[in-house]
Amino acid sequence: MSKTKGVFLFAKNNGQLDYVKQAVFLAKRIKKYLNVPVSLATDSPIYLQETYGTDDFDKVINLDYTNNSNLRYFYDGAMSKKQGGFKNANRADVYDLSPYDETLLLDTDYIISNDLLSSVFESNADFMIYKKSSDISQARNEDEFEKIDDVSIDFYWATVVFFRKSETNKTFFDLVKHIEQEWHHYRRTYQVKSHLFRNDFAFSIAIHIMNGFQPGSFAEELPGTMFYTADRDILWEMNDDKMMFLVGKENYLGEYTAVQTKGLTVHVMNKFSLTRIIDKELANE
């Protein structure tokens, strides 16, 4: 019997940002470039149904609505920011929620523009995640994504995770849940300065523990490199697999350099500019 495979997304709206809209847009690109089914877990299923419908998804899983969130600032370029809730809890529930034997977990602001990640389903690796990353500006300090803190362990991105259902991987995701529940203990143990819970940190700590508290081979590298733009940058234009970014100049607040990508999948951290582009794209369908 062949194994089932697909992409899994979470979408929890926070009053400032429409993650459901992001998920709908990303699902369309996943079907186009990766050609695999997409499942969505959301706390806004009625909004999804009434606004966009569910045709873009293989399965929609209803999550309980909660106001629990981490407050943080969301930037829209260098000169604008808004405070909102960051509903990033329970990402590790993907192991139990996913209907697939082989799952590619993605953030909704990870804009697929090629078929590179389709190769993970043919890989022999049971757990894959990005450690290698690159700022598309190629000109800014990237140290914050090397370690979870200056003198702590290696940083891994929870933005993209591939896993197969197995007892070992169940142990990993149960461990991430435990780290989330006891975050303040693990934050102090691993010398993380920020009080804000981040899945990147929790996944990094869990990988360190799974490796026996030393460098190891539990997590294998996803294909390619995790490219990203900061929330101080602006996604300005999109045309199929081409994107134009205004990348903030370091030490020159409010000044930008235009950077164009083609066929490059990018983690777009400025979700406001992403939303403006999505509105244009969906209006043109």
Regions found by a protein language model. Give the residues of each.
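Short, acidic, metal-binding catalytic loop of nucleotide-sugar glycosyltransferases
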Residues: 26-36
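Active-site-proximal specificity loops/subdomain of glycosyltransferases
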Residues: 47-98
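Glycine-rich phosphate-binding "P-loop"
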Residues: 4-18, 67-78
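A glycosyltransferase accessory/donor-loop signature
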Residues: 1-11, 20-21, 40, 51-56, ...
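Short, polar loop motifs at secondary-structure junctions
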Residues: 42-48, 65, 112-114
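Residues at the starts of beta-strands that form the adenosine-phosphate
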Residues: 36-38, 102
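GT-A fold catalytic core of metal-dependent nucleotide-sugar glycosyltransferases
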Residues: 87-138
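Conserved catalytic core of nucleotide-sugar-dependent glycosyltransferases
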Residues: 120-182
